[in-house]
Amino acid sequence: MNTQSDSAGSQGAAATSRTVSIRTLIALIIGSTVGAGIFSIPQNIGSVAGPGAMLIGWLIAGVGMLSVAFVFHVLARRKPHLDSGVYAYARVGLGDYVGFSSAWGYWLGSVIAQVGYATLFFSTLGHYVPLFSQDHPFVSALAVSALTWLVFGVVSRGISQAAFLTTVTTVAKILPLLCFIILVAFLGFSWEKFTVDLWARDGGVGSIFDQVRGIMVYTVWVFIGIEGASVYSRQARSRSDVSRATVIGFVAVLLLLVSISSLSFGVLTQQELAALPDNSMASVLEAVVGPWGAALISLGLCLSVLGAYVSWQMLCAEPLALMAMDGLIPSKIGAINSRGAAWMAQLISTIVIQIFIIIFFLNETTYVSMVQLATNLYLVPYLFSAFYLVMLATRGKGITHPHAGTRFDDSGPEISRRENRKHLIVGLVATVYSVWLFYAAEPQFVLFGAMAMLPGLIPYVWTRIYRGEQVFNRFEIGVVVVLVVAASAGVIGLVNGSLSL
């Protein structure tokens, strides 16, 4: 039996120099959240909903994702010593495997998002450089691969260099978005066009409930990254900066998203928006000011995707490295180079990104399919973190067993009853919202997500047995059963041809 404390890795990681300021944390949140999704949101929403349902959807998403943001805000205050919130909160509260599955899902979602970002990047370039057009998918796949390894070379040089690049690209890409809002609001928005078919009764997109349900996956996709500050909590100069950066980043992104999606419905009808290409914001501005508007937005998209690509390649390696430091997967994966970068975790992430590039290329997978699959995987840590906050607010602790909670410093500041009640409301809203999102998702992507999660059992179980430790607690056994059943259903669907990307 290995008696070494599991918290050693996280605590050791916490001892690293804290160099990331609140401005950089906010830039990381906006940089990783305002990626490809915001540029395709007019077409994404227009394909499934009208302007009325869009407003209802943003109201639900705003409340839901704000509750998710506040979950990480509250947990950062209640457990200020825990690093990489998307991983540590679930592990301390619900068990080692739940923490592992949260980090594994977050990592896989980030990997798939990387491929989606790069695909949209080169498809946008294809409008101006025919070599990268949809007529040359092999060339685009090679270009995506080259970009992936180039970014690996950047992030492997350390946090400070990559974070600086993220800050620069975040500032650069916000400018075209602000130009879009100003130009459309004053030159192109028509209230009559916005209200002519408010509920899309002529668009063939179903009932209002179906429309709201349909846009949920896209609203989540464009908000993913809101937890970015908590992931990099161990590099923050101050733990209070983590909480403040999360809220500031959320409000900024929400204002951008609501403005862009609402203004688009005042320029083109729901049917016209649905027919646009992935870079639909460029087409909307082109309809207002001409071709130069499309070029401006395309430039912003390229800068946006580049910044998000760097951010997510940084973010996805972090939980993988911490799991290795904490003994949930082989410790060599957590190797740190002389520049302070988790180079082995970044290398493995880059290799897996390359594998998905090949898989998606062979299956001719669309950008929208990548979005839906990645979104379902991101929901795993959101759900478990929200559930942990509910447990803290109701019983003051998570599930206690020999391999969760007791090996961590589970202490925290004193919380008043009044604050606890507020935290319970936040946790319940975030939990219900996360469950609703799984319901709103298309079933095939839930099953594909389960199949992607299942292989993670191999390194986890092997490492636990090697260390002579208990593999699962009772709650985790239930999680594994659900995972195996869903993955089995997915495999059966693939075999009989009823399931495909």
Swiss-Prot record:
Segments crossing the lipid bilayer: 25-41, 52-76, 92-113, 138-155, 174-191, 214-232, 247-269, 292-316, 340-362, 377-393, 424-440, 447-463, 477-495
Gene3D superfamilies from the UniProt entry: Amino acid/polyamine transporter I
Family note: Belongs to the amino acid-polyamine-organocation (APC) superfamily. Basic amino acid/polyamine antiporter (APA) (TC 2.A.3.2) family.
Pfam families recorded: AA_permease_2 (PF13520)
GO CC annotation, single: plasma membrane
Name of protein: L-lysine transport protein
Membrane topology, as annotated: Multi-pass membrane protein
GO molecular function: transmembrane transporter activity
UniProt-annotated location(s): Cell membrane
GO BP annotations, alphabetical order: amino acid transport
Keyword terms: Amino-acid transport, Cell membrane, Membrane, Transmembrane, Transmembrane helix, Transport
NCBIfam families (alphabetical): 2A0302
